[in-house]
């Protein structure tokens, strides 16, 4: 089985490469920047311009599409560039699209673009599997709990997460390779739904920190959707 991993320099892409190493697959990777210490064949490609896409997808059976851009050129990469990629996949046996839980319910631009990409994939002729996951542990840590301010975590304490280990999700995606196209799967979620305040309390206890917690409220549809747990799924508790 010949596999292409896009976005091989990102967090999910790196986790995929770590676990694909040593498995009985022919693996090719593609990105704009060549990863350090590459163990696989690397091909340059750019979703923004479309440059290198044909060479990247040539002679592969399965694509795991880990390329994404939450903050920069999001529309051009998540939608416009994605359309360019889909147009070159007539020969593909399976396209695995990692996505995010709740993107159809949370009013956030990047999520709307991911949902648009899901719809483009569904309406294409490409055989696909869509696998949605909740936020990674590292995302919650780096975005909200990485640096206390004057020995206090100043956080929107009521918002909820069901964070998951990126390596667990990567392992799950690799297991899908030999299962063929399955459409949209059940959500892949972390084991516990917790408020950000509860996460901060747990971090303080585990690390024996002396930091305090200051929970502050926000307003708006995005904040309310996270309080309601639209980014979680209590029926799916996985990794």
PLM-predicted stretches and their roles:
Residues 25-32:
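Conserved glycine-rich Rossmann-like NAD(P)H-binding loop of the short-chain dehydrogenase/reductase
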Residues 35-92, 100-106:
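NAD(P)H-binding glycine-rich loop region in Rossmannoid oxidoreductase-like domains
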Residues 1-25:
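N-terminal Rossmann NAD(P)H-binding glycine-rich loop of SDR-like oxidoreductase domains
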Residues 6, 75, 79, 107-115, ...:
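Short-chain dehydrogenase/reductase
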Residues 132-138, 155-175, 184:
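Substrate-positioning beta->alpha
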């Amino acid at each position: 089985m010949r596999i292409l991993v896009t976005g091989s320099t990102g967090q999910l892409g790196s986790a995929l490469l770590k676990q694909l190493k040593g498995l009985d697959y022919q693996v090719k990777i593609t990105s704009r920047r060549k990863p350090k210490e590459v163990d696989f064949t690397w091909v340059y490609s750019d979703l923004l311009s479309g440059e290198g896409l044909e060479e990247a997808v040539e002679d592969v059976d399965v694509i795991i599409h880990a390329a994404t851009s939450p903050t920069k050129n999001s529309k051009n990469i998540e939608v416009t560039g994605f359309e360019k990629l889909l147009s070159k996949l007539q020969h593909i046996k399976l396209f695995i699209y990692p996505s995010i839980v709740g993107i159809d319910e949370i009013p956030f631009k990047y999520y709307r673009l991911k949902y648009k990409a899901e719809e483009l994939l569904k309406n294409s002729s490409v055989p696909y599997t869509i696998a949605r996951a909740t936020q990674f542990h590292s995302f919650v840590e780096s975005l909200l709990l990485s640096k206390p301010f004057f020995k206090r975590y100043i956080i929107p304490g009521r918002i909820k997460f069901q964070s998951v280990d990126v390596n667990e999700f990567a392992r799950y995606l690799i297991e899908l390779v030999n299962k063929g196209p399955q459409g949209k799967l059940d959500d892949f979620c972390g084991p516990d739904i917790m408020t950000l305040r509860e996460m901060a309390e747990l971090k303080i206890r585990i690390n024996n920190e002396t930091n305090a917690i200051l929970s502050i409220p926000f307003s708006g549809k995005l904040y309310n959707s996270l309080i309601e747990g639209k980014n979680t799924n209590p029926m799916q508790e996985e990794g």
